[in-house]
Amino acid sequence: MLRIGKLNLSTMSSAQQRLAQVGSHLTAQKQSLAPQRPYKITVIGSGNWGTTIAKVLAENAGLRPHLFQHQVDMWVFEEKINGVNLTEIINTQHENVKYLPGIKLPKNLHAEPSIVKAAEGADLLVFNIPHQFLPGICKQLSKATLKPHVRAISCLKGLEVTPNGCKLLSTYITEHLGVHCGALSGANLAPEVAKEKWSETTVAYRLPNDFQGHGKDIDRYVLRAAFHRPYFHVRVIEDVAGVSLAGALKNVVALGVGFVHGLNWGDNAASAIQRFGLNETIKFAEVFFPGETNQDTFTKESAGVADLITTCSGGRNVRVAKAMAITGKSAVEVERELLNGQSAQGIITSKEVHELLAAKNLTKEFPLFEAIYQIVYGTESIERLPELIEEDE
């Protein structure tokens, strides 16, 4: 007499037997996806986006004890707020009063001032820092004893430019720490996500060559369970290069939108800048990462056109560029006045992109990216932007 669990198949119709078998298979599959022990999550970074992502992860860790350890660690660069350590404030008041004020954080989110202590024992490292700090962060993390099969997700926006080309920051993490790394990017303004206003994002992750198996290693199921919330919907794809490039280059485009807003040129001009920017982003991917990206990532995913639209509708880069246009001040001056110690990533990314294009003699192939660089760092005026990017018939 054949049984599945407590079910007696001999007393069932063929259709009922098939349903029972399928249900049993799905139950076994679900159980196989549960890890042998809960995964530990650590967030590297505690700015407004870093703290927001840590909030999301801690909420899910609290809800899914079969998958994740209850406590999520967040590495915080220690600083004093009215004479009190920021980590102490976060751990006692459950609020990042400097970078995400007014948002209550889960009690299982623990602020840790030691980056080595925060990283050791982690199964998943989530990097969320200004990208120019990554080399120093990796140098510090090289002193930590990381788990043999720790995995990572990069929420960083930028590129590593070398004389020979450019690398994804996820690749930089892998090369310097030996940690397989994916990427997260999407139409996600941190204050809106922190306030639990509905949005979506894209996680890009390919299974590593040394994948240990479901239930033993981080996979798409685990990543979606870690990041997906009712107010923060997640799609997991494999195009790490496309997601990373879209996340980096949209900040350069947003500077252009900020410039035209500062001159009160209107929505038509802002839309034109975004069209140029999307086209140059796709072209950049084709030139520097041939065969590694999927054009659908730029046109159909949250990490692509949706993030471009959102970033160009507000955010740091637009604010900084708009203030530059209105006041005539430099990017450095405006950043210092507006951003409370944070940075507009488009400023440094535009310089990195220019250096790469100049080294490859390709500046004329990317007129918008080059024009924005020349306005920020060179002698060009914002008023000449239409002339600088004008297309031939």
From Swiss-Prot:
Disulfide bonds, paired cysteine numbers: none
A single Gene Ontology CC term: nucleus
E.C. no: 1.1.1.8
Binding of substrate, residues: K157, R316, N317
Binding residues for NAD(+): G45, S46, G47, N48, W49, G50, F133, K157, A190, R316, Q345
Keyword 4Fe-4S included in the entry's annotation: no
GO molecular function, one term: glycerol-3-phosphate dehydrogenase (NAD+) activity
GO terms for biological process, alphabetical: carbohydrate metabolic process; glycerol-3-phosphate catabolic process
InterPro entries: 6-PGluconate_DH-like_C_sf (IPR008927), 6PGD_dom2 (IPR013328), G3P_DH_NAD-dep (IPR006168), G3P_DH_NAD-dep_C (IPR006109), G3P_DH_NAD-dep_euk (IPR017751), G3P_DH_NAD-dep_N (IPR011128), NAD(P)-bd_dom_sf (IPR036291)
Active site annotation, chain numbering: K250
Keywords for the protein's UniProt record, in alphabetical order: NAD, Oxidoreductase
Catalysed conversion reaction: sn-glycerol 3-phosphate + NAD(+) = dihydroxyacetone phosphate + NADH + H(+)
Enzyme class: oxidoreductase
Family, per entry: Belongs to the NAD-dependent glycerol-3-phosphate dehydrogenase family.
Name used for this protein in its record: Glycerol-3-phosphate dehydrogenase [NAD(+)] 1
Native source organism of the sequence: Cyberlindnera jadinii (Torula yeast)
Gene: gpd1
